[in-house]
């Protein structure tokens, strides 16, 4: 991809690649990723970075983008995941519940949910380690709430809008979730009103994560 225009930029700057030259390199746009995805992939991936993995963005802001990751990008993602858990003092031996959208959901995710042996690759090296329960966010909120009551997780991860809907369900029924120790939001802009709803329902502060499939973690909410 860059071979098409970098030689011209370098020639115009007598082969110099200083900051002034870098500023002439066009900023990569989402449309560029969609139109030139294959030519943006490295042709010489180091052996130590293999195997490659593939993925796709959610398409929440437009047409999805196809992605290619490496062993190194996976390691970095897991490292930042673990750092977030440790920053917020989460008990890795407890249960984590995740409610989100799945591109190709297992039938159980639309009904009783699934139980996984660990929270994921970032924590599976620890012992004792907690399990994870997952459910599709397309399930009605009332059913999600019943499922949470049955699963009794220590931590709940979902979208801000879904967390707010669950908090409203909890307040309407005047029933809390005694096991809950932490709430984590992903995938959407978190508002002050949504924070307040969770505070009122569960006496807990939402810990927000800002990330994207294309680049991984962008920001973690400060523990302070």
Each PLM stretch: what is its role?
Residues 15-18, 73, 115, 141-143, ...:
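Acidic, low-complexity intrinsically disordered regions
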Residues 82, 86-122, 132-135:
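Conserved AMP-binding loop of ANL adenylate-forming enzymes
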Residues 48-58, 106-114, 137-141, 161, ...:
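Short low-complexity stretches enriched in small and charged residues
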Residues 77, 108, 218:
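Short Asp/Glu-rich motifs
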Residues 125-224:
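Active-site glycine/GP-rich loop and adjacent strand/helix microenvironment
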Residues 11-17, 116-128:
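Intrinsically disordered, low-complexity coil segments
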Residues 67-69, 108-110, 168:
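A short secondary-structure junction signal
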Residues 1-56, 62-95, 102, 150-157, ...:
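Nucleotide 5′-phosphate-binding alpha/beta core
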């Amino acid at each position: 991809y860059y071979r098409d225009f970098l030689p011209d930029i370098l020639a115009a700057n007598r082969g110099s690649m200083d900051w002034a030259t870098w500023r002439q390199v066009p900023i990569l746009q989402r449309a560029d990723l969609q139109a030139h995805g294959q030519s943006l992939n490295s042709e010489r991936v180091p052996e130590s970075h293999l195997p490659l993995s593939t993925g796709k963005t959610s398409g929440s802001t437009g047409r999805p983008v196809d992605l290619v990751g490496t062993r190194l990008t996976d390691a970095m993602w897991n490292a930042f995941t673990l750092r977030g858990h440790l920053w917020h003092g989460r008990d890795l031996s407890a249960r984590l519940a995740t409610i989100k959208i799945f591109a190709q959901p297992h039938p159980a995710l639309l009904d009783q949910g699934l139980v996984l042996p660990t929270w994921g690759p970032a924590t599976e090296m620890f012992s004792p380690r907690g399990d994870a329960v997952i459910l599709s966010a397309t399930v009605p909120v009332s059913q999600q709430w019943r499922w949470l009551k049955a699963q009794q997780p220590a931590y709940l991860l979902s979208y801000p809008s879904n967390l707010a809907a669950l908090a409203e369900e909890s307040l309407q029924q005047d029933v809390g979730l005694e096991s809950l120790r932490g709430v984590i939001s992903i995938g959407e802009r978190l508002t002050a009103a949504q924070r307040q709803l969770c505070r009122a329902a569960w006496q807990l502060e939402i810990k927000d994560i800002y990330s994207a499939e294309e680049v991984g973690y962008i920001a973690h909410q400060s523990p302070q």
